[in-house]
Structures are given as C-alpha cells and as structure tokens.
Regions:
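Short, well-ordered alpha-helix to beta-strand connector turns
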Residues: 3, 36, 64, 155-156, ...
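Mg2+-dependent phosphoryl-transfer enzymes with acidic/Ser/Thr/Gly-rich catalytic loops
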Residues: 1-5, 22, 195-284
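Short, structured coil segments at secondary-structure junctions
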Residues: 57, 63, 71, 180-182, ...
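Short, hydrophobic/glycine-enriched beta-strand segments
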Residues: 4-9, 40-41
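Conserved acidic, metal-coordinating active-site core of Asp-based
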Residues: 100, 107-224
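Active-site metal-binding loops of divalent metal-dependent hydrolases
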Residues: 10, 44, 226-227
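Active-site phosphate-binding/coordination module
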Residues: 23-128
C-alpha cells in the first residue's frame, strides 16, 4: 500500500509534553511533504492557534495542505486559511452543555470555541500555563449571557478542564444526562479535558470528508494519536497508529503501536517506516 496522507493529533502525539516539536518530527514531515505527501494536523484546537506550528513544519500558507480543527468541526486549507467546511453546534445546545458542565464543580473552567475565537470562563492556573506554553490565543470572559450565545460566531465545541479524572467523569455524566447522549459527541483529551461537539462530528468523519474531497481512498490514509478523541480517526484510517504513550484503548484500536512516545519522535518513526522508506502495511 502506498500512503498519500497522514493525519496526526497534536498534544501528546506530535508535540512534546512542553508543547515544542521534536526536530526528528520536523525533518520527517518536511521530507514527506517535499515528496508530495499530505501531512494534516487533526486537532481539537482552532486552526488559528496552530499557525505557529505550521510555520515550524513548513506548512503555513501551503496550497493543497490542510488542517482539521475542533475535533473535526472544521476543515481548512492552509493557503489563505480557506475554510472548506464547518460543522457547528446549535447555540442553544452549546449553552445547555456549558450550564450543565459548570454546575459540577466551582473550580471547573470552560472553553467555548467559535470558528475564529476561543473564549475561556473561570480560567484555572494550570490551564493558563498550558495555554501559554502552547501559544494559544484566547479571551477570558465572565458568565456568558443569552446574547453571547445568539450573537456568537458559529460555535465549534464546548470543553471543560479539571485535573481530577473523577470530576471529568462527573462532567461527562452531567452533560450527557442533561442534553442526551444522542445530541453530542463526547470525548476526553490531554488527561485534562472533557470535550463536546455536535453529534457526528469527530476526527474520523472529518478525515473521511477530506479524503473524499481529495479523491483518496481511506486505505491511503495513515492516522496517529494517543487519546480517546483520536479513536474514530484511527478506526477510519487505512493504518491506525498509536504513540507509545497512548492510552490502552487507543493501543488496542491501532493497527500498530510505535516504539517511541511523543517526546521522542513517534511521528517521525511512523513516517520513516511507512512513507519515506516505502514500507507498506503488509510488513506490520
């Protein structure tokens, strides 16, 4: 099998724990792109916030290179940040998700992602540091009133941050009980976030939509990730790859598990094995 596109999660996959990029990953990505390969960050973040990373990878402003943002809520071409597709939350549903989540604990902070902006309510100290390390632009807000929801740009997702797994599970339960599990896609990420998108919006379906637009079969697509919000794209891809630091559920889903973790060039390992050296999946 000849692979033509690699979709990659960012945090705890492509990026080191401190938010930087291993130079092995940078070199391998640039080498693959130089051969006509497509490297697509597939992230929960906004496409605006990944622009510094795209510059490091040599992808910023490139025609026929893409970013999938908001866990599949938007597909954007790097040239001119041309938005090809958005799949937004209904404003009323977004408001209900927010209200349900913050009721669980007074220490919870909440992120509201619109197509162009990130708003954060009750910003925590740990989240402030996390955002700073990754140069993610955001705007702090007070409690959002009805006008906020009705006048906002299209809302891509609502997420909640808390360091305790038990609290994150409570948030998940509270939101799903309130709005109904059929109304949203609910996932965990980065061992700190609980994320809610519109039903049917996840990284896997977005990968399929992009592949269709590019005339690719999913058998020609590789995907790599570490956490539960990556499961759908690993399942959808022709070759699903887990980094060594991935959670057990991801490792079980993946076709192959890398030797290296995110801090030691797992993405480069995958590219060198399956793209740059022309090794196909028959050797797994």
């Amino acid at each position: 099998m000849t692979y033509r596109m690699f979709v990659s999660d960012l945090d705890e996959t492509l990026l080191n724990d401190d938010g930087t990029v291993n130079q092995k990953n940078v070199a391998a990505i640039k080498a693959a792109v130089a051969q006509g390969f497509k490297f697509v960050p597939n992230t929960g973040r906004s496409f605006n916030s990944v622009q510094p990373l795209l510059e490091i990878l040599g992808l910023k402003g490139l025609k026929d290179q893409y970013v999938i943002s908001y866990n599949g809520g938007a597909i954007v071409e790097n040239a001119g940040n041309k938005v090809l597709l958005t799949r937004a939350l209904d404003p009323q549903l977004a408001s209900q998700i927010f209200e349900a989540g913050i009721q669980v604990n007074s220490e919870i902070d909440a992120h509201i992602y619109t197509v162009n902006h990130l708003f954060i309510y009750n910003l925590s100290v740990t989240d402030r540091r996390y955002m700073s390390e990754r140069a993610v632009p955001y705007q702090k807000i007070e409690y959002p009133n009805a006008d906020f929801w009705t006048n906002a740009e299209p809302i891509m997702k609502v997420i909640f941050e808390h360091p305790e797994p038990a609290v994150r599970e409570q948030i998940m339960t509270q939101v799903l009980t309130t709005v109904g599990s059929e109304a949203v896609e609910a996932t965990y990420s980065s061992s700190r976030y609980v994320e809610f998108n519109r039903a049917g919006v996840e990284k896997g379906s977005a990968t399929q939509l992009l592949a269709e637009q590019l005339g690719m079969d999913m058998s020609e697509v590789m995907a790599i990730g570490d956490n539960s919000n990556d499961l759908a794209m690993l399942e959808a891809a022709g070759l699903g790859i887990a980094v060594a630091n991935g959670i057990e559920e991801v490792k079980k889903m993946a076709n192959v598990v890398m030797k290296y973790d995110n801090n030691h060039g797992a993405v480069a390992e995958a590219l060198e094995k399956y793209v740059l050296k022309g090794v196909d999946d028959a050797s797994i």
